[in-house]
Every structure is written in structure tokens, then in C-alpha cells.
UniProtKB/Swiss-Prot annotation:
This is PTS system arbutin-, cellobiose-, and salicin-specific EIIBC component. The active site is at residue 28. It comes from the Bacteria. The gene is ascF. Its main location: membrane. GO terms for biological process: phosphoenolpyruvate-dependent sugar phosphotransferase system; trehalose transport. It is found in: Cell inner membrane. The chain crosses the membrane at residues 102-122, 147-167, 177-197, 207-227, 254-274, 285-305, 330-350, 363-383, 389-409, 433-453. PROSITE patterns: PTS_EIIB_TYPE_1, PTS_EIIB_TYPE_1_CYS, PTS_EIIC_TYPE_1. Coiled coil: none annotated. It is a multi-pass membrane protein.
Length: 485
């Protein structure tokens, strides 16, 4: 049965406290992300029971509504109900600064910046894999123009990642996007890259008598992110000191002259060191624990997705693949985690007597197993029924251990699933093909069996029908409150 996205959007907005309680909305691959003015106006119990809503995640003033793979359709309906000139709400007061709030702010900035970039990163990754397969199979020869262009297409999103990060972060930090892109562009300019290559070879490089640290910024996330955050403060300060008559030309010139050298001399190197330190910590643990670290990550992955913490690993994965050509801890652990959620959803679809739950579970299983998108299975089935989540965690640990022992590593960062399994193929290790499909099969079968053994409390058909009637009774009152520009 097709979802009524218009009714879904009306119900979600009503449960969030109406149009007047929403200051901004965006979406990632599976979630609608609302910025809320007053959390007290949110009707969480109603929001969670709206058919089509797989789950709800709260974070400070943001409410994330999990829809699944069709989130873009729901997003279009939500946007149609909101004012076209919507502006973010002004903060009522300055919140108290605590370590928890600082940590939450950093995580929110990272997730808010990286989430819109994931489609471009995955698209580039898959094109690079296609080029690798065509070369391995002999369809294209090494050095051929077609292969070179394919590699350039696949590499574009990674090489110019600082520009993409700057653009996305500018939206997040509410600063001028063109200035952010211009300053990030300095870091990947061919002349600057050449200068940094000379510095790396020992040649003294300075700017205004200040030594410049030899750093490579292509394929990086943290430097551009920190730089754009600093730019948001620099822009406000420069705006406050420049006369109104000179703002058109003096303000942008001063901003660039302040922010660009600051990025080159201080912010950029610090950002690289932070990123390198995080990567070193993660892979030092992997070096000590070996396959056990992959197993632990496989069990924890669904819990990390629940909190949004899984996005923390995105910069680390990108940097590791850029430096070594593959990643062997986080990505292999996702094979078992994603397909285990798919297998447990299949078991629920097999066992349930609720037609609506069966339909939800089958769709969620297909999404997790085929495409590696596990959130519909996680929120729509596993968390909802609890015991399938336990089965998935156990299966994820065991499959992670097998993937770690087999030495599987990914050459891309697409969500691991059947369609993206090619990213784990290693030309130097033909058995990697066998191992990746073996781990996938084990994940589906093991989680399926464990879910049947543990059982689950089925949702009565009467309850589902009552929820559907409640959903259909929602009137489009929200639409009357909005100016449809």
C-alpha cells in the first residue's frame, strides 16, 4: 500500500507543535531533521505512532523523524506546508556552557555538515569501484583516457571535499557560503598544493615571515569544518567594524585577508592534527585488538546509529581510504550489522500475524540486505519489538569477528549491502569475494534464526487498525496556517 505522504507530513507537523514551532527542516538519507523552537510543544507519543514514522530521535533543539528510504517524498510534502521565507528562530537566552553541551555541539556540527554530503561521497565511491572492476576485468586498460576520466569522476567528490564541507558547514553555521568556499578553495588550489609538496620535501615556505606547515588538504574534512566555524565569527566581527558605505567591497576583502591566512597558518594544520589523532586512536585500538575490534564494532553499530554517533567515523574512513586505499575496521563491521538487521526483519515478517507489520518488515529487510540502509529495519522493527534488536547485536558481533578474521577491507564508504558488496573485493586477494558473501549469508541466516529462537511480542492487528484510523482522521489544519509561497 502506497504511503499518503501529504497526510504523513500534516500529522508530523501537527505532532511537532505546528508550523510556528518549526524554525528549519532538512533531511538526510532516511530522516527528516526539524529544528524546533520549543521542545515542550512536541507530542512525542503521537509522533511515534504515526504510520510511516519508523522512529524519533531527539537532540537538543533538533527532532529527527525517521521515515526510511522514501524520506525525500515526505520532505517535499513537509516543505510545501512550511513558509517559503522561514527563518531560524532566535535563541531566547545564552545556554550554560558545559562539557556535555560542547560535546553535543561538536557532534551536531559534524553530523549536520556531513549528512548532506553523503550521496556525493557514495556516488563518487561507486564510480571509483566501477573503474577498478573495468580495469581488473580487462575491459579498460590502465592509462586509457576513458579509465582516467572515470577515475576523475569518482575522485572529484573526494579531492574537492574541503569545498563541499565548507559549503555545507556555511549553512550549518549561518555564514556566507561563497566566502567559505573561496577560502576552502585556497587549500586545494594547484599552486598551493605544489607549494605544500615543496615544503614536505624540506623547502622553507613562509607567509609574511611566518613558517607554513606542510599539509595536504585534499580528501580532508576537519580543517574546512573548523575554518568555516571560525569564519562565522570573523564575518560578524568584520561586519561590526566596517562603515556601511564600504561594506560591499571592504567587508569581503577583510574577511578573506583575515580568514585565509588564518586557515593556512593555524586552523588548517590544527584540523589535520585533530583528524590524524582521531584516526590514530581508532586504528591503534584496531591494531591491538585485531578481529575483536571489528566484532565489537559490529555489535555496537546499531546503537551508534540510534544516537547518530556513527557519523563521527565518516572523516576517519575517508582519510584512511585516501591514504591507504582501503578501510578494515568500521566498514567490515557494518556488513554484519546491516544484514543482521535485515535478517531479523525477515524473521519478523515470517512470524507476525499483523499484515501491516509484515509489510513494514519486508520492506525494511530488503532495504538493509540489498542497499545496506538499515534504519528502516532498526527503527521500524528491531527497536519497536526489542528482541529482534538483541538478535541483531549478537549476530553483528559474530559476523564482525568473521569479517575481521578474514581480513575484509572496503575500498569505498557506501553502506555495505548486497548491491555494494563490490567495494570489499580485493584484486590481491581473490578469496575476499567468497568471504564477503559468506559473511552476508551468515548475518542474514544467523539473525533470522536467533530472532525466531528469542521470539517477540507481536503487535495486535486491532492496535494497528486503530492507529491507521487515527492517522486517517487527521485534518489538514496545519496547511491553513501556512503561506504557500
Amino acid at each position: 500500500m502506497a504511503k499518503n505522504y501529504a497526510a504523513l507530513a500534516r500529522s508530523v507537523i501537527a505532532a511537532l507543535g505546528g508550523v510556528d514551532n518549526i524554525s528549519a527542516v532538512t533531511h538526510c538519507m532516511t530522516r527528516l531533521r526539524f529544528v524546533i523552537k520549543d521542545d515542550a510543544l512536541i507530542d512525542s507519543p503521537t509522533l511515534k505512532t504515526i504510520p510511516g514514522v519508523l522512529g524519533v530521535v531527539r537532540s537538543d533543539n533538533q527532532c529527527q523523524v525517521i521515515i526510511g528510504n522514501t524520506v525525500s517524498q515526505a520532505f517535499q510534502e513537509v516543505v510545501s506546508l512550511l513558509p517559503g521565507d522561514m527563518q531560524p528562530a532566535q535563541p531566547v537566552g545564552k545556554p550554560k556552557l558545559t562539557l556535555r553541551r560542547i560535546g553535543a555541539g561538536i557532534l551536531d556540527a559534524l553530523i549536520g555538515t556531513m549528512s548532506p554530503l553523503i550521496p556525493a561521497i557514495i556516488g563518487g565511491s561507486m564510480v571509483k569501484l566501477l573503474a577498478m572492476i573495468l580495469e581488473m576485468s580487462g575491459v579498460l586498460t590502465k592509462g586509457s583516457p576513458t579509465l582516467t576520466i572515470l577515475n576523475v569522476i569518482g575522485d572529484g567528490a573526494f579531492f574537492f571535499l574541503p569545498l563541499m564541507v565548507a559549503a555545507s558547514a556555511a549553512i550549518k553555521f549561518k555564514t556566507n557560503m561563497s566566502l567559505a568556499i573561496a577560502i576552502a578553495g585556497v587549500l586545494v588550489h594547484p599552486s598551493f598544493i605544489e607549494l605544500m609538496a615543496k615544503a614536505a620535501q624540506g623547502e622553507h615556505v613562509e607567509f609574511a615571515l611566518i613558517p607554513v606547515t606542510a599539509v595536504k588538504y585534499t580528501y580532508t574534512v576537519i580543517p574546512a569544518l573548523v575554518m568555516t566555524w571560525c569564519l562565522s565569527y570573523i564575518e560578524r566581527w568584520v561586519d561590526s567594524i566596517t562603515p556601511a558605505v564600504t561594506k560591499n567591497f571592504l567587508k569581503p576583502m577583510l574577511i578573506v585577508l583575515i580568514a585565509a591566512p588564518l586557515a593556512i597558518l593555524l586552523i588548517g594544520p590544527i584540523g589535520i592534527w585533530i583528524g590524524s589523532a582521531i584516526s590514530a586512536l581508532v586504528y591503534t585500538i584496531h591494531g591491538y585488538l585485531g578481529w575483536l575490534s571489528v566484532a565489537i564494532m559490529g555489535a555496537l553499530w546499531p546503537l551508534l546509529v540510534m544516537t547518530g554517533m556513527h557519523r563521527v567515523f565518516t572523516p576517519t574512513i575517508i582519510q584512511t581510504i585516501a591514504e591507504t586505499g582501503k578501510e578494515g575496521m568500521v566498514m567490515p563491521s557494518e556488513i554484519g550489522a546491516n544484514l543482521s538487521l535485515g535478517g531479523s526483519s525477515l524473521a519478523v515478517a515470517w512470524k507476525t500475524k499483523n499484515p501491516e507489520l509484515r509489510q513494514t518488515a519486508l520492506a525494511a529487510a530488503a532495504s538493509a540486505i540489498m542497499a545496506g540502509i538499515s534504519e528502516p529495519a532498526l527503527y521500524g522493527v528491531a527497536i519497536r519489538l526489542k528482541r529482534p534488536l538483541i538478535a541483531s547485536l549478537i549476530s553483528g558481533f559474530i559476523c564482525g569477528a568473521v569479517a575481521g578474521m578474514a581480513g575484509l577491507a572496503s575500498h569505498s564508504m557506501a553502506a555495505p549491502g548486497l548491491f555494494t558488496s563490490v567495494q570489499f573485493f580485493d584484486p590481491a586477494n581473490p578469496m575476499s569475494i567468497v568471504w564477503v558473501f559468506a559473511v552476508m549469508a551468515l548475518a542474514v541466516v544467523l539473525s533470522f534464526i536467533l530472532t525466531l529462537l528469542l521470539g517477540f511480542e507481536d503487535i495486535p492487528v486491532e492496535e494497528a487498525a486503530a492507529q491507521a484510523r487515527k492517522y486517517q482522521s487527521v485534518q489538514p489544519t496545519v496547511a491553513k496556517e501556512v503561506s504557500l509561497n
